[in-house]
Amino acid sequence: EQAENEKNVKIKQRLLTFVVVGAGFAGVETAGEINDFLHEAISYYHNIKRDDVQVTLIEAGTTILPGFNKNLSKYAHTRLEKNGIKILVQNVVTSFDGKNIDIKKLSDSSSESIIDSHTLIWTAGVTPVEIIQNSAFKLKNGKIIVNEFLEIPNYPGIFAIGDCSQLDSETNNKFPPTAQLAEAHAKLTAYNIKQIIENKEKKKFEYRWKGQSAVIGKRYGIAEAMGMKITGFWAWLLWRNYYLTKMPNIEKRIRVWLDWNIDLFSRIDISRYGFKRDT
């Protein structure tokens, strides 16, 4: 709404430029969803053209979605650019003052540029919460080191799971920050707590990778599952069906399924405040 009524070209440009930092799962899916939403919503705003809106994705690494097969990452890169998203790899954000985003190219430290934008979305990584940093537990890279039972060494019966934990450094094994892993951690920890209560033998954590998928725009995705590499509509459909199975009960699955089907055949739903302007 603000950009629709803005007369200053530079301010309007800032309002319609959206920058997402970090091209992992969260960054790519966020950029894709924002881009789709904006370009569909434009039809409601007569003073905004399609070319006025720009979504930029910034990644410090050499490729987006580095955890995927290279061909799948390349497909995602091409699809996002085809949808109008600008992708800058090997670039980092050095500062943001609410109006200007300063970025620097890693391959050339003298190469700096500025993106005019009011909106910066950060998905490039997280730091541990203060309670972990100030704890008495042994840390590595800001994460609590755990043993093969997900217990904290020297603190029997105390577990650390999910993004805040890392296997003992001697195993040279890190945990990927995914919901799939967090769910596996939670199930094993619940089981081991039960075993401790009953004075029975605990079970070691063994991570069984089930595959992965990412949405890269409306009705497009990439996926790796059962040794197969899938792209496009079928990968997107696989992603949706998998997440339906994660709904806690049949009622919620039906609600989500109906909502997704309505979304397939209807225009985007937006809410307008309808502010009155002073005349």
Which functions belong to the PLM regions below?
Residues 27-28:
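N-terminal Rossmann-fold NAD(P) dinucleotide-binding loop
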Residues 1-21, 37, 104-110, 121:
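FAD-binding core/adjacent interface of flavoenzyme oxidoreductases
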